[in-house]
């Protein structure tokens, strides 16, 4: 988060993650210096909800069926996410959960965030660890269906860094969330297959652990047994991609002083090269006064169209609330997205009418100010 550039984070396709591990939607960004946050986890913009009203239709249990996701959160498989059991298990991940933050009911639904403090990866073709600082964003809709986004970094046994975003959905009542990994690995070498293989999996969470089992469904037979998910009508959808916006800066709202860890790279991956700068804490002053939690990062992407910043992290105001943040875009055109409880003092942040300064020098990292958008 100290310098810049600007490039899209997710290429091609509609909202969500693409079938061959290419997440779709607009471009997210990462740049040398930018703090960004999360607008949720779907494929559409954070505007109007889907037209459906029920959590699912079809089979009452979606464990062995193909799940057809709501158009707002397709995970790159709009025609249906196959049952993992129809494929071949390729690797498993055990994540350690260090904390769970209940954000409350936000503009999108009931949100909680699980902090990942590490983990292990086991499989014949992939072994290694999961770095601390991962984020698991779980959204429960008013109809009981669930949507998920996870942001993780794998470190293989031969010291290769791999960037992972998991997109997930579940019908009301399902304990396991069906996930589609969007993986950015070096395009040459022994992990290039992760960029293009059609992978799906399951995510099961307990109080202190998340288990991911990932399957290759490239040769899975087509299924006519389907469960169709529909988001509640009249509710905004979260966005898989960065939110855009234009305008001029008005009054300042609050300022962050963000502490940063040592950066590392995911080089020559399918979308370009990522410079990942861990967020290790910080403070906020102004209308949001408190601290920045340790976790998340600025996942900067340098690609063919330039460098973009994509910072994901969480604010903890001094009154005990939590605010999820995603600050995205080219360094001089950052647009933040916030997610706060609709019955709390920071619900005004959910309106999406804000702009961000470029990152400047700060104590131990960078300083960023957010402004009302005129």
Please state what every model-predicted region is.
Residues 1-66:
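Ser/Thr-rich, Pro/Gly/Ala-heavy low-complexity intrinsically disordered linkers and tails
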Residues 67-374:
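Beta-strand-enriched cores of mature, soluble protein domains
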């Amino acid at each position: 988060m100290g310098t810049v550039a600007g490039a899209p984070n997710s290429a091609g396709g509609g909202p969500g993650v693409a079938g061959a591990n290419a997440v779709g939607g607009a471009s997210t960004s990462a740049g040398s210096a930018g703090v960004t946050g999360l607008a949720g986890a779907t494929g559409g913009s954070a505007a109007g909800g889907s037209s459906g009203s029920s959590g699912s239709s079809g089979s009452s249990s979606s464990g062995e069926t193909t799940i057809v996701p709501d158009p707002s959160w397709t995970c790159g498989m709009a025609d249906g996410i196959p049952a993992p059991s129809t494929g071949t298990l390729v690797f498993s991940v055990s994540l350690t959960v260090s904390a769970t933050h209940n954000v409350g009911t936000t503009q999108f639904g009931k949100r909680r965030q699980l902090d990942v403090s590490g983990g292990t990866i086991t499989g014949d073709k992939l072994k290694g660890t999961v770095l601390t600082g991962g984020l698991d964003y779980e959204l429960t809709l008013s109809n009981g269906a669930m949507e998920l986004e996870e942001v993780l970094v794998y470190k293989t046994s031969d010291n290769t860094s791999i960037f992972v975003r998991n997109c997930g959905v579940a019908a009301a009542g399902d304990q396991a969330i069906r996930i589609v990994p969007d993986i950015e690995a070096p395009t040459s070498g022994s992990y290039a297959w992760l960029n293009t293989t059609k992978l799906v999996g399951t995510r099961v969470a307990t109080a202190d652990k998340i288990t991911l089992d990932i399957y290759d469904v490239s040769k899975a037979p087509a299924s006519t047994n389907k469960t169709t998910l529909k988001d509640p009508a009249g509710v905004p959808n979260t966005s898989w991609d960065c939110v855009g916006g234009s305008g001029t800066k008005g009054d300042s709202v609050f300022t962050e002083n963000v502490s940063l860890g040592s950066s590392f790279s995911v080089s020559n991956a399918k979308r370009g090269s990522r410079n990942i700068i861990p967020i290790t804490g910080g403070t906020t002053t102004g209308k949001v006064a408190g601290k920045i939690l340790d976790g998340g990062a600025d996942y900067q992407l340098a690609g063919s169209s330039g460098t973009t910043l994509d910072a994901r992290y969480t604010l903890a105001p001094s009154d005990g609330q939590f605010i999820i943040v995603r600050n995205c875009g080219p360094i001089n055109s950052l647009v933040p997205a916030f997610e706060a409880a609709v019955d709390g003092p920071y619900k005004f942040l959910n309106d999406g009418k804000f702009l961000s300064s470029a990152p400047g020098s700060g104590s131990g990292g960078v300083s960023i100010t957010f402004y009302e958008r005129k």
